[in-house]
């Protein structure tokens, strides 16, 4: 099977390499900040100035080419309209539309009456109101989806942590790693909620339209910087969001490494490597996140750092490496499972049943290893169309509900956890039964022996008297009588008053051939008390005369 293992590793590395190359050029959420939008506009401006210089050297024209702050207009023909496609570097533009400008017979661009500003028609570049409303509803649905998902995951993970932490029998290295993973999912959810509150700075179409219509885009680009102290809080929120996001990916990797070592490493000491796993999960992400924060504060300290401009690879590359490595571990683990299935089929087992087991195990591994990450990483970003909307819903669904799925796999469906919960439930029911008074006094749990003595003295005319006598002694060798299942409980003592709760029946024959009298028979003409003793080794609740 060496060829299969080699093929698995080759496929894994090829997929990882291609996905890293694609993902490195893409944004993580399909949106850009104002700073990034300005960078794109400035690059277009520089290219336009080079083109204008080249056109001026070619010769004189009617209307000179120029940069109006958004579009680089070419030479215009006298008395005609010039049409230029809406620029693709403006995010919220209709990239299928066209902008218009008029070249007057005087050889100058038409200007707005009463102003020195050049007239241009950008109406076709702006998204239509119905389209804009549709995009807004789409993003609102995504927000509701991942908010509900992260909330459910947070609650289920919190309960799972309490369950595993409460039962001491569940305290082991494997469950310690699970707890760290649960905490990383919870911190990721909390950081996303905080980030949504304090770092909402994405560029909207209304803001861009107002800048374009007012002609203030160039002034905004070159204007004075604002007070940066107001962005300290949101910068901290963004840094913590990126850190907890990275720790979550790396704790998923730790789970994969732990499972992989259990399968492939002989005599694996999980306790020995626990601190190493903790360093990978919490320590290593802090290194590259701090490096990114220092680079951002030094080179591009603008607004909230919600999305970086060119330095995103500092934290994206390690995260993508963790996703790719986890995917390779997943492939290798599935390969081992498939090999075991084929070996089992060779000895005559049901093939369909074995493949169902393989499919079930693979599904669990998909949730544990986070295989959906590698699937979405390899998908190209189109930022439009039905497929992109479906992809965004699927990606955010799995990302937000993954914590809930992991809690089910590692806690709620875990046999050890279920056994401990059942034990606690049984003990709780027994404690409730002990506190509740029995209806007929027929069941007693304790070490006090109850005896009932009927007096036949001369004072019997005054009525029978009942008293409790503590009797000590060894049980006789009489045969054990069959009693109900409560005798098997520790500390149970059979009481003669239990006959009061039973239906009267004829006396039954004992093994010695004697007949036993029920409690409804006349009082025995004997002054000897009837003692009830508890023998832990022999019969329970045996009676004998003293």
From Swiss-Prot:
GO cellular component terms, A-Z: plasma membrane
GO molecular function ontology, one term from the record: G protein-coupled receptor activity
GO terms classed as biological process: cell surface receptor signaling pathway; positive regulation of cold-induced thermogenesis
Domain of life: Eukaryota
Pfam families registered for this protein in UniProt: 7tm_2, HRM
Residues the record marks as carrying a glycan: 51, 106, 116, 121
Keyword entries, A-Z: Cell membrane, G-protein coupled receptor, Glycoprotein, Membrane, Receptor, Signal, Transducer, Transmembrane, Transmembrane helix
Transmembrane segments: 144-167, 175-194, 236-258, 274-295, 314-334, 362-380, 392-414
PROSITE patterns: G_PROTEIN_RECEP_F2_1 (PS00649), G_PROTEIN_RECEP_F2_2 (PS00650), G_PROTEIN_RECEP_F2_3 (PS50227), G_PROTEIN_RECEP_F2_4 (PS50261)
Chain intervals for the UniProt region annotation (Disordered): 497-546
Leader sequence residues: 1-24
Subcellular location: Cell membrane
Membrane-topology annotation of the record: Multi-pass membrane protein
InterPro entries according to UniProt: GPCR_2, GPCR_2-like_7TM, GPCR_2_extracell_dom_sf, GPCR_2_extracellular_dom, GPCR_2_secretin-like, GPCR_2_secretin-like_CS
Record topological domains on the Cytoplasmic side: 168-174, 259-273, 335-361, 415-546
Start-end of Basic and acidic residues biased regions: 506-519, 537-546
Complex formation: Binds to TIPF39/TIP39.
Family affiliation: Belongs to the G-protein coupled receptor 2 family.
Protein name per its UniProtKB record: Parathyroid hormone 2 receptor
Originating species: Mus musculus
Biological classification of the source: Eukaryota, Metazoa, Chordata, Craniata, Vertebrata
Gene (name only): Pth2r
């Amino acid at each position: 099977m060496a060829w299969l293992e080699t093929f698995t590793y080759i496929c894994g590395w090829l997929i990882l390499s291609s996905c890293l190359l694609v993902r490195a050029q893409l944004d993580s959420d399909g949106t850009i900040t104002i700073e990034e939008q300005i960078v794109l506009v400035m690059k277009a401006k520089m290219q336009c100035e080079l083109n204008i210089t080249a056109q001026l050297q070619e010769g004189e024209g009617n209307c000179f080419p120029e940069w109006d702050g958004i579009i680089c207009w070419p030479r215009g023909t006298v008395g005609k309209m010039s049409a230029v496609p809406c620029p693709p570097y403006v995010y919220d533009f209709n990239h299928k539309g066209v902008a218009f400008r008029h070249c007057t017979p005087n050889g100058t661009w038409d200007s707005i009456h009463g102003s020195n500003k050049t007239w241009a028609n950008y109406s076709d570049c702006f998204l239509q109101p119905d389209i804009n409303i549709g995009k807004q509803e789409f993003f609102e649905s995504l927000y509701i989806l991942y908010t509900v998902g992260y909330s459910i995951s947070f609650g289920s993970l919190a309960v799972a942590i309490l369950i595993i932490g409460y039962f001491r029998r569940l305290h082991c290295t494997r469950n310690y790693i699970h707890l760290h993973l649960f905490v990383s999912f919870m911190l990721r959810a909390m950081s996303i909620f905080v980030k949504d509150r304090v770092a909402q700075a994405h560029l909207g179409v209304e803001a861009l339209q107002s800048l374009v219509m007012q002609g203030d885009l160039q002034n905004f680009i070159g204007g004075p910087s604002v007070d940066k102290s107001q962005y300290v809080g949101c910068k901290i929120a963004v840094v913590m969001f990126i850190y907890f996001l990275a720790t979550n990916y790396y704790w998923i990797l730790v789970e994969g490494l732990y499972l992989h070592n259990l399968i492939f490493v002989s005599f694996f000491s999980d306790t020995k490597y626990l601190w190493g796993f903790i360093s990978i999960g919490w320590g290593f992400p802090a290194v590259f996140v701090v490096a990114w924060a220092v680079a951002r504060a030094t080179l591009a300290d603008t607004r909230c750092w919600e999305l970086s401009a060119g330095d995103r690879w500092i934290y994206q590359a390690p995260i993508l490496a963790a996703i790719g490595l986890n995917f390779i571990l997943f492939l290798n683990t599935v390969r081992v499972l498939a090999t075991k299935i084929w070996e089992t089929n060779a000895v005559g087992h049901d093939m369909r049943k074995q493949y169902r087991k393989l499919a079930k195990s693979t599904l669990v591994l998909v949730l544990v290893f986070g295989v959906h990450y590698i699937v979405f990483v390899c998908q190209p970003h189109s930022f439009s169309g039905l497929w992109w909307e479906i992809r965004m819903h699927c990606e955010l669904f799995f990302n937000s509900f993954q914590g809930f799925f992991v809690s089910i796999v590692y806690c709620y469906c875990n046999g050890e956890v279920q056994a401990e919960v059942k034990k606690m439930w049984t003990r709780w029911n027994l404690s409730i039964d002990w506190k509740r008074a029995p209806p007929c006094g027929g069941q007693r749990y304790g070490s006090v022996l109850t005896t009932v003595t009927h007096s036949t003295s001369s004072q019997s005319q005054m009525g029978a008297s009942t008293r409790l006598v503590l009797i000590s002694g060894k049980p006789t060798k009489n045969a054990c009588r069959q009693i109900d299942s409560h005798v098997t409980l520790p500390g149970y003592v059979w009481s003669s008053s239990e006959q009061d709760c039973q239906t009267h029946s004829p006396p039954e024959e004992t093994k010695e051939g004697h007949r036993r009298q029920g409690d409804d028979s006349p009082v025995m003409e004997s002054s000897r008390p009837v003692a009830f003793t508890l023998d832990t080794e022999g019969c329970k609740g045996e009676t004998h005369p003293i």
